[in-house]
Amino acid sequence: MAKVLVLKSSILGDYSQSSALIGHLMSHWQQQGAQMTVRDLAADPVPVLDGEIATGMRGGDNLSPRQQQVLDLSDELIAELKSHDTLVIAAPMYNFSIPTQLKNWIDLIARAGVTFTYTETGPKGLLEGKRAVVVTTRGGMHKEGASDHIVPYLKTVLGFIGITEVEFVYAEALNMGPDATAQGLLEAKTALDSLTA
């Protein structure tokens, strides 16, 4: 049975197109017997990385209460990620990039010596053998264009921690009129239906 960790990051709640598409995929995969864990990074945000937190992420004996709390949360998030086979990320495009809420999660799980390490031949990810599916929604048309910073960024950061099998599902033109919206969502759902857990 596949164990799937789902990350939602839209700030739009019930109006979120990316969350609706994630729900479609979850229903599809649950019928296949997948076990799902959902973390809504907008409804339950993680702290923003700052100087105090960055220093505390290195560990040590003299951490402030805040540093220890965030380090414990980082450990929890990493353990959660490690315990799942597949990572599903809802990544709506906000101003050509991912939501802040998703970036904050990445900042807490990308840790030297824990999810990646440095070797004589360069960095090596420590979370190998996992798969990621990214569902990305956009108001306009950005796929494979210079304005799409989501795909190269997520490919890079996921690959850096060892997750190199990454599939992207796009829902585009969602702010370009009812017909374009319907077509964009239909194409995304069709792509999601072709994926197996």
Curated annotation (Swiss-Prot):
Q: Which residues bind FMN?
A: S10, S16, Q17, S18, M93, Y94, N95, F96, T137, R138, G139, G140
- Co-factor requirement: FMN
| One Pfam family in the UniProt entry | Flavodoxin_2
Q: Which GO terms describe its molecular function?
A: electron transfer activity; FMN binding; oxidoreductase activity, acting on NAD(P)H as acceptor; oxidoreductase activity, acting on NAD(P)H, quinone or similar compound as acceptor
| Reactions that this protein is recorded to catalyse | 2 a quinone + NADH + H(+) = 2 a 1,4-benzosemiquinone + NAD(+); N,N-dimethyl-1,4-phenylenediamine + anthranilate + 2 NAD(+) = 2-(4-dimethylaminophenyl)diazenylbenzoate + 2 NADH + 2 H(+)
Known InterPro entries for this protein?
Flavodoxin_fold (IPR003680), Flavoprotein-like_sf (IPR029039), FMN-dep_NADH:Q_OxRdtase_AzoR1 (IPR050104), NADH:quinone_OxRdtase_FMN_depd (IPR023048)
Q: How is the cofactor bound?
A: Binds 1 FMN per subunit.
Query: Which branch of life, at top level?
Result: Bacteria
Residue runs in coiled coils: none
UniProt keyword list: Flavoprotein, FMN, NAD, Oxidoreductase
EC main group:
oxidoreductase
The record's EC number reads 1.6.5.-, 1.7.1.17
The protein's role, per its UniProt record = Quinone reductase that provides resistance to thiol-specific stress caused by electrophilic quinones. Also exhibits azoreductase activity. Catalyzes the reductive cleavage of the azo bond in aromatic azo compounds to the corresponding amines.
Subunit (UniProt): Homodimer.
Q: PANTHER family recorded for this chain? A: FMN-DEPENDENT NADH-AZOREDUCTASE 1 (PTHR43741), FMN-DEPENDENT NADH:QUINONE OXIDOREDUCTASE (PTHR43741:SF2)
Q: Which family does it belong to?
A: Belongs to the azoreductase type 1 family.
Protein name, UniProt field: FMN-dependent NADH:quinone oxidoreductase
Q: Origin organism of this chain?
A: Shewanella denitrificans (strain OS217 / ATCC BAA-1090 / DSM 15013)
Gene behind the chain: azoR
